[in-house]
Amino acid sequence: MKLLRIGAPLIIASALALATAGAVAAGEIKGKVNVQGIKSAADIAVYIDTGADKKFDVPKEHVVVDQRRMTFVPKVTVVLQGTTVDFLNSDPVGHNVYWPSISGNKKLAHNLGTWPKGEKKPFQFNDLGVAALLCNVHPEMSGYIVVAPTPYFAVTDRDGNFEIKNVPPGDYTLKTWSEDGKPVTQTVKVGAGSVSVELTVKK
């Protein structure tokens, strides 16, 4: 019985040490996206495209895209493949959200219909790619859902800065998507600390 009493805390301590080591080992990618021929460095999606060869748990919590003052908020939303997005209508008028394709595949087109203020429509994005959000009622509205293969992603601020946290150590390929620029890929090696990268997106 004494051996059991002594061993149990040792097992627990070892498990805690391993868990702590795993948490400490996670790194982060801090970067900046420069642009050429594009009016703004804001709202550019940056995500790990390859290198994380595993299946990820889909978040139970839904991501919310609001419709406010005749705009999609946020304009660009990145989600892990399989995530459900709730499209909320905060405007006093009805909206009809649809996308004509996902990355050019018209078979993935979808129309959510029209709904009034205060209500929301959910949709689960199971296909990788980019859905260009439009509104049948208000043609001036536009937004984007970028469906990524990993949960390691970010959207640039107005100065082009971004930060991707809690990335396991490894060799990865970063990829960008922007409304007006061509995609850019760059390899990055992530360790236990922070790694800095700089990307240039051209029209």
PLM feature spans:
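Hydrophobic, helix-prone linear segments
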Residues: L3, A19-T20
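Extracytoplasmic copper-binding redox domains, predominantly the cupredoxin/blue-copper superfamily
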Residues: V24-K203
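Bacterial N-terminal signal peptides that target proteins for export
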Residues: M1-I11
